[in-house]
Amino acid sequence: TRSLFHKEYAAENRSIENDLEAVSFLLTDCQLIIKNFDTFFLPDNEAITSFLRGANPERIAWISPDHSSVNQEGELLDRNGIPVSFHRESSSKIQIRSAGKDRVMWTSDDVVYPDRKTLSKAN
């Protein structure tokens, strides 16, 4: 059976914001299930995606090996085919960024999760 992530990530009826939120939920699951998650060296997209595909102590694959949004380099792609950017802000907080419709990272149309609106709702 396919996971909910497999069915919904980059699906036509969802948005980039939904996709990034789904990735954030997977990372939260990792933090809850994998002992000492904060000690793992996960510096980039490839390392994080590998971890989410089962290269972790529990061998849990949150992202299936054949997911269409993972490229040959093992990077998770956004719905525009651009590798997602992960920025580990602390031991428990990872910011996730999509290049947006212009397909260029670090421009004004990038989609970031959590964004300032999400953070202000939480406070």
Q: In which residue ranges do the predicted regions lie?
A:
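Amphipathic alpha-helical segments typified by the pilin-like N-terminal helix
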Residues: T1-N18
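Low-complexity, acidic interaction segments enriched in glycine
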Residues: R14, N18-N123
